[in-house]
């Protein structure tokens, strides 16, 4: 019984890491395909919120970007500050900037997403709360 429970818990953690990495990979692909940058990033954000809530890292009525950032930090404790900061910048730029997002913004977003995916793949498991 205990071994089966351990295997199930481990698979859930592995699937969570894969789920989050897949969200970032998919968003990078959308950007590469020329999709609307803001829309792709908002979809990424919404998907992450869904996963983080489902795993118990983010409360349903969260209100601030800081709470979201803390949830990502809790879910991915080994994610580098640089990767988290670049990801925050992408979300903030898409949400709050009024200018047209161009190639430089797209490249920055793709680099941030790719970096986070690479780190998640190195880190491995995400715990359940």
Task: List PLM regions with ranges.
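Hydrophobic, helix-length membrane anchors
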Residues: 1-39, 126-129
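Membrane-proximal, non-transmembrane interaction modules
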Residues: 30, 37-129
